[in-house]
Amino acid sequence: MTRIHPTAIVEPGAQIDESVEIGPYAIVGPHVTIGARTTIGSHSVIEGHTTLGEDNRIGHYASVGGRPQDMKYKDEPTKLVIGNRNTIREFTTIHTGTVQDVGVTTLGDDNWIMAYVHIGHDCRVGNNVILSSNAQMAGHVEIGDYAIIGGMSGVHQFVRIGAHSMLGGASALVQDVPPFVIAAGNKAEPHGINVEGLRRRGFSPDAISALRSAYRLLYKNGLSLEEAKVQLRELAVAGGEGDAAVTAFVEFIDASQRGIIR
């Protein structure tokens, strides 16, 4: 049976699983879908065309599915889609997409979103991502699986942050961070491969060694970006356990529109 506090407002049209719990003074809009065993904290607002999957935990005073902070937005029925088993803590704001992009903001599964985080319109957050308190994502930001964003960091619009990377606290990021790389500073600069994170996630010593070699080619050998990419492509077909990881590294760089941190 759905447990809805008597002071909460659930507008007609909302689709709420019978196992959902909604706390005091929370508001759920008419175009919202909430999956099984999800809990909505007190005073939270879930609005817009928002879909929440199963087993999510929304903290007190969170604002989920709000209008994009984009002056071009004209009340189009854009969306926010959130997967399963996400923790979204107090005072977090997550906005719907815009028609200037694909019209949807997405958050995958098993993410840990700490207090006061902002996820802007059209962002695409993968799985198992950690966004530390007060991390701020502008519109159209992409964050790969297992990335970690330090507290008080700011990420410029359209920036891409690769899988398994890490952005240090209080950083200002204006260009893309390749996968597996640690970045920090204002403005953020590269500081090596995220070795500890890769070990925790089961990457083999050979794969980590290959990524370290890739990092040296890109950042330490005095090569231009185009020269480095030629050698990185050769490294990616060396026949070792690190080929797949190095290939992902190179493909991310090739796809960059804003340029990578250097």
Curated annotation (Swiss-Prot):
GO CC terms of this entry: cytoplasm; membrane
Q: What class of enzyme is it?
A: transferase
Taxonomic source organism: Burkholderia ambifaria (strain MC40-6)
Which family is annotated?
Belongs to the transferase hexapeptide repeat family. LpxA subfamily.
What does this gene product do?
Involved in the biosynthesis of lipid A, a phosphorylated glycolipid that anchors the lipopolysaccharide to the outer membrane of the cell.
Q: Which reaction does it catalyse?
A: a (3R)-hydroxyacyl-[ACP] + UDP-N-acetyl-alpha-D-glucosamine = a UDP-3-O-[(3R)-3-hydroxyacyl]-N-acetyl-alpha-D-glucosamine + holo-[ACP]
Kindly indicate whether the keyword Cytoplasm belongs to this entry. yes
Q: What is this protein called?
A: Acyl-[acyl-carrier-protein]--UDP-N-acetylglucosamine O-acyltransferase
Primary localization: cytoplasm
Q: Where in the cell is it found?
A: Cytoplasm
Which pathway does UniProt place it in? Answer: Glycolipid biosynthesis; lipid IV(A) biosynthesis; lipid IV(A) from (3R)-3-hydroxytetradecanoyl-[acyl-carrier-protein] and UDP-N-acetyl-alpha-D-glucosamine: step 1/6
Q: Which Gene3D superfamilies match?
A: Hexapeptide repeat proteins, Udp N-acetylglucosamine O-acyltransferase, C-terminal domain
Drop me one GO molecular function for this one.
acyl-[acyl-carrier-protein]-UDP-N-acetylglucosamine O-acyltransferase activity
Query: What are the GO BP annotations of this UniProt entry?
Result: lipid A biosynthetic process
Q: Does the keyword Lipid biosynthesis apply?
A: yes
* Subunit field text: Homotrimer.
Q: Which domain of life is it from?
A: Bacteria
Q: Which UniProt keywords apply?
A: Acyltransferase, Cytoplasm, Lipid A biosynthesis, Lipid biosynthesis, Lipid metabolism, Repeat, Transferase
What gene does the UniProt entry assign to this protein? lpxA
Q: What is its EC number?
A: 2.3.1.129
Q: Which Pfam families match?
A: Acetyltransf_11, Hexapep
